[in-house]
């Protein structure tokens, strides 16, 4: 077993960073994309202020999220061909397609090309957490998952900062072209990425049945998988619009400057680091389930604050929302992986990706339609309240799961 700060875990965190840089480009540059392919009007509707209607943006982002369903079979391939192979292959392909999106001739072309890169990068993110769990013991596991989440967050934050400071020089096309840098760095990162011993031991065990990549999960695991997937669905109903529309809301509607947006992202990065540290401690001392529940409630409340209509509310809500999501990440990542044995763990991660995609699609379309229907005035605030708060109810499902704090996966599933 490795410690959370050993090179194999750091290597996986760097892959998560690269995936975050590639995936978050559509979010951070959405304002520029809307201005390039849309039309800013003089009215006060969402479309006049943003450049494209809330429905158009919501549907476009929903398509990007739906494309992530392709991450389900790709993540499942890690149960057949190994964690290392799939991590490196999916990250490389996803980043290459992100670079290609820079040449998009129109909005729907942009959506189509960028959507092709979503499945491999989603698989990278999902399998990276699986590998981190398998590389570490119980005492190090929440720390390792927190490091993976931090890596993804840093990658996403870098995209947002670069866009905020250099959008006039680079435009959205330049932002996407920068994904070539982490693509090149994969040559160095791959030296640190190793196959977890838990997986290699499973490969040598000829008594273990090899299941189809997207085959049915064994009956003993289906109840837990259904509960975990429903919780992931609820979380994503919140995070889909809360994270995906916040920068176009800041830049095109609230008219926040690039420097202020960068400051908001840096502040969120600091808060996110604090949230990860707090979440890691809470996961190991308070428990996985209550920590996840608290994170869900915080994301909903602070997400609504971010869209409440004022710049201070936007900045404060975004920063605190990132902190709440970071509190959730170590506990949620550990819980979702500790509940299932090694032979199906990557496939389960794929099903969780699918549940998250469906939740995000529901949230994005609901938010976009509500913002358009509400017309003038504080349309985003109305959409946020109606979309976010009901999703908190999914947190109650956590208490149908066993608490995994302080336990090895083998203690929960002897087949693991």
Segments from the language model and where they lie:
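Conserved MFS/SLC helix-loop-helix module at the cytosolic interface between two early adjacent transmembrane helices
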Residues: 69-105, 286-289
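Extracytoplasmic gate region of multi-pass secondary transporters
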Residues: 27-28, 222-273
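Glycine-rich segments within core transmembrane alpha-helices of 12-TM secondary carriers
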Residues: 140-167, 352-364
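C-terminal transmembrane helical hairpin of 12-TM major facilitator-type secondary transporters
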Residues: 283, 287-332
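Central cavity-lining transmembrane alpha-helices of secondary-active solute carriers
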Residues: 59-75, 266-278
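Extracellular/periplasmic helix-loop-helix junction of adjacent transmembrane segments
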Residues: 30-68, 259-260
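Cytoplasmic helix-loop-helix junction between adjacent transmembrane helices
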Residues: 113-150
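Helix-loop junctions at membrane interfaces in 12-TM secondary transporters
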Residues: 102-113, 169, 307-317
